[in-house]
Amino acid sequence: MSTYSARFGKVVRELKSTAVVSVNERFGDTKAPPAQVTALWDTGAYSSAISEKVVDALGLKPIASVRACGVSGWYDSPVFKIDLQLPNKIKITGLPVSLGKMVAADILIGMDVLSMSDFNFTNKGETVLSIRTPSEGDAPFVADTQEAARSGGGQYPFV
């Protein structure tokens, strides 16, 4: 099992970390050195995407194309296969990624990657992002809340 936690020092609306992207040896020239990148963790993204900057830096060649949808709408996108090392040192090999139209990060980590791990974030005073790979099971928030209600707690106003 591998774990990772990042403390942001305040409540944030973007979950970012570093990651390492490299050429998948079956689909490209492995002479390009791995690239340390800024990763944006996006639970609303079905799949992961990389920036044109990373594609160019690694000399990635497309293996297919897809119709993708981002915040700016639908577009045709090439697909690349990469190797991705997460901050918890877990390496995902042969990950298909589309070309994303991104400004805030070099790679967008979507649910295709997040679903391989236990992933949560908390916001009590500061944002803390936690990842555990492989998945060990659920986080029993409902059971915890029901127990708090039985013991006299359990009021959670939206502020």
Annotate the PLM regions:
Residues 1-159:
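Pepsin/retropepsin-fold aspartyl endopeptidases
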